[in-house]
C-alpha cells in the first residue's frame, strides 16, 4: 500500500544500496529500497540524483555503462517509484548505454519532443536523434 508521503532518494542512498560498501549505511539503504520495492513506501529518484549516481559510478568506481544503466533502470521500475519523469529517465538510460553520450544530454534528448526542442551547440544531440533547433 502506497503512503501519501513520497521520499526523494538522494545519491548516497542509491550508491550504498547498489555498492553494498558501508557497514552501517548499506543495510539501511537496502531496507529502505526493499520497502520501495514492496510498495510500503513511495519514493522518487530525482533526475539530478540519477545524474550524480551515473557520474560517481562511472568516474569514481569505474562501473561499466551497461551495469550502471541496468541497475538504475531496474531501480526506477520498482513498484514504489513514482517519478512523473520515469519514462524519460528510463529512455535516457537506454540512450546512455547505446550512444556513449553523457547522461545529461541523454536526459535532455529523452525529454525533448517536436513541441519542446533542445537548443544547443552540442553535436551529440544529432547522434541521439533528439528534437533540436540550432541558433
Enumerate the predicted regions with their spans.
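Acidic active-site catalytic centers that drive phospho-/nucleotidyl reactions
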Residues: 10-12, 52, 105, 122
Amino acid at each position: 500500500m502506497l503512503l501519501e508521503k513520497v521520499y526523494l532518494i538522494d545519491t548516497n542512498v542509491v550508491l550504498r544500496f547498489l555498492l553494498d560498501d558501508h557497514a552501517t549505511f548499506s543495510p539501511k539503504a537496502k531496507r529502505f529500497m526493499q520497502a520501495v520495492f514492496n510498495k510500503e513506501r513511495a519514493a522518487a529518484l530525482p533526475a539530478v540524483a540519477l545524474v550524480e549516481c551515473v557520474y560517481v559510478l562511472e568516474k569514481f568506481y569505474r562501473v561499466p555503462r551497461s551495469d550502471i544503466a541496468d541497475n538504475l533502470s531496474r531501480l526506477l521500475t520498482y513498484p514504489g517509484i513514482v517519478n512523473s519523469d520515469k519514462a524519460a529517465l528510463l529512455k535516457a538510460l537506454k540512450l546512455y548505454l547505446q550512444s556513449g553520450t553523457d547522461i545529461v544530454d541523454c536526459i535532455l534528448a529523452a525529454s525533448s519532443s517536436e513541441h519542446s526542442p533542445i537548443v544547443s551547440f552540442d553535436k551529440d544531440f544529432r547522434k541521439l536523434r533528439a528534437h533540436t533547433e540550432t541558433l
